[in-house]
Amino acid sequence: MFERFTDRARKVVVLAQEEARMLNHNYIGTEHILLGLIHEGEGVAAKSLESLGISLEGVRSQVEEIIGQGQQAPSGHIPFTPRAKKVLELSLREALQLGHNYIGTEHILLGLIREGEGVAAQVLVKLGAELTRVRQQVIQLLSGYQGKEAAEAGTGGRGGESGSPSTSLVLDQFGRNLTAAAMEGKLDPVIGREKEIERVMQVLSRRTKNNPVLIGEPGVGKTAVVEGLAQAIVHGEVPETLKDKQLYTLDLGSLVAGSRYRGDFEERLKKVLKEINTRGDIILFIDELHTLVGAGAAEGAIDAASILKPKLARGELQTIGATTLDEYRKYIEKDAALERRFQPVQVGEPTVEHTIEILKGLRDRYEAHHRVSITDAAMVAAATLADRYINDRFLPDKAIDLIDEAGARMRIRRMTAPPDLREFDEKIAEARREKESAIDAQDFEKAASLRDREKTLVAQRAEREKQWRSGDLDVVAEVDDEQIAEVLGNWTGIPVFKLTEAETTRLLRMEEELHKRIIGQEDAVKAVSKAIRRTRAGLKDPKRPSGSFIFAGPSGVGKTELSKALANFLFGDDDALIQIDMGEFHDRFTASRLFGAPPGYVGYEEGGQLTEKVRRKPFSVVLFDEIEKAHQEIYNSLLQVLEDGRLTDGQGRTVDFKNTVLIFTSNLGTSDISKPVGLGFSKGGGENDYERMKQKVNDELKKHFRPEFLNRIDDIIVFHQLTREEIIRMVDLMISRVAGQLKSKDMALVLTDAAKALLAKRGFDPVLGARPLRRTIQREIEDQLSEKILFEEVGPGQVVTVDVDNWDGEGPGEDAVFTFTGTRKPPAEPDLAKAGAHSAGGPEPAAR
């Protein structure tokens, strides 16, 4: 852009830097550019401002009033603020709109006015110069100074070529001149694609079949290579054969659109080709080259590819194509005659280091657009995090998108007015309404008082808005690595941002949180807690899942419930768990339902039950319930998931499992646990029983699963049988759910120790675990309590106490019955139920 600046415009930039140094500012903002324009003194901008009574001293004093002096003089290079960069971009647009091939002082001033939000615009308004009036003055003076400023242009504009009107009427209608866009500075810089650009130049310089086609994955920079070629042509960095060439991109959609009758499309395409032949200096760029095949071929008409083939073969038409690997294979390779006319140029995905260099090259454009400052750490984070966590897209596109959205996010946050300004607006509106009511009531004394209040509020609001605009908006906001991580977290649901103090505390207390739902099972709770902490601290193996466990042990001891509790801890919802019942996959052919049916089979387009869910929620807990019931082929498919953290679905897409926790539950080796010690509870030799069961479970797992499957599992956890104390604690949890339902009816529920003990005795089975406990509570407590509520024996405002008759606490309790007594809740203790017996709104029970 700076090569288009006139000598006076360049002098303005130098003077702006000097003004920044004088004010001890370590940046060049719009205010310094304005000072430079006035200080220059001879250009159209200076004359325009002088005619409006704007002096250098007046502007300086206003700048010092709004911003003030800096602490110390800056050393070395002083950078432009994003807003100042935006002004310089706008000056180029103003020059192009006026048909000038140079950027003079007047264009910089017009850019300042068009930007309209910086300190410079505030200063002009404060000094009584309306922005529209300043613009009119510049345009008026331009008529007298245009010839003089053009003489200053020097090397700017490359001899005025960009100012000449285009003669390519048809091409301008159906395409876009990339060389003109490059000359006007509208194209982003191209970083590190020298080899690809050189290869394209070599193919274009051939005598025949001089048509390169850029092949690469979406988002790797195929179009950027062509834009780089256009910039090389503009800068003269091409061989003699390509000098003075014009690079046009053809829009096939525009060619086809509106062609209602047979022959319309062919006629348009022939006109384009005729114009290219007449000009002789046109290189055609067709993005999405595969759209040539079949384009316009309705009702028997020949398609665009067939029309272009003869000219491509004879070298009469030079074309650059771009398409993806899949589309090239699907469309171009099938048409051998078309394929041989194009020479493939592979465009690979850049490395993370190369992507960082690309982002640094684009930084100025995004800073100017979003009016923020983007740190080096943000660019490194964008490249590395995008490469690690966004697996279905390619660099540098996904990293650029992260930077772009983070900048947009920061700008939106800063441009939102503070809440106190909205409060002022509400108070002013209220004062006006009250004033009008007072006038209608002819209470003029009150109306005068309200008028004064309104004026005071308006003045206070104006002062607060001035502070906001001159303070917050002129402090350049920074986009750093933390904001990049937050944007990525919003995209993928993977929490990669830094741990807050609250989350750190919560993670350290994770076992305690899980034990609110899980009774006992210390080993299992510790294992999953460590896996989650490892992931959030960033220390897990980046190529494997966050954790993989086999939960083995008797039925009904909390294996599935722990998985649900973990999902609830991470996402706040039990439904966040991806639960796969492996009993549905006992046949070999049912494996395709998990990963997606192969082509040609029913359900191919739908995707797999597992792969689709994980693809949409990559940070999740996946539970494979009762894994031993699945077919052996499924275990083979899961080996790659456990080792490499990825799996290819039926449609060839790679699904990332690196941020999932994989849990397999199994009941293997526990079928003979039916002879407990004592009355259904583990006592005395319980630890020996557990070790015996653990050994048997491990032996059964080794028999059932292949060694390569078990070897990839992080930990095999054998759950304990439940003890008497744990069953009684489960009673408390389950009763809390019933009490929570009663609380909505203004009732409370209290169970005596005897009632809890009898429920535990009747509800526990050594084979089925604690699952029967839920049915026992439903039968003995909920059913009887519902009848008493319907018979109005108990009601709102009462505490229902459940006790036991005919049981001494030791025997089998076959004749024991539960009794329900309703008493009025004391007024002083409205939360008696909560204090007395685990009443209100506890978590879901863990009797599984």
UniProtKB/Swiss-Prot annotation:
Q: Where is this region: Repeat 2?
A: 80-144
GO BP annotations listed: cellular response to heat
GO terms assigned for molecular function: ATP binding; ATP hydrolysis activity
The UVR domain covers 425-460
Annotated region described as II, given as residue ranges: 479-670
Please list where the region (I) is annotated.
Answer: 171-418
Family classification: Belongs to the ClpA/ClpB family. ClpC subfamily.
Tell me, in a sentence or two, what this protein's role is. Answer: ATP-dependent specificity component of the Clp protease. It directs the protease to specific substrates. Can perform chaperone functions in the absence of ClpP.
The name on file for this protein is: ATP-dependent Clp protease ATP-binding subunit ClpC1
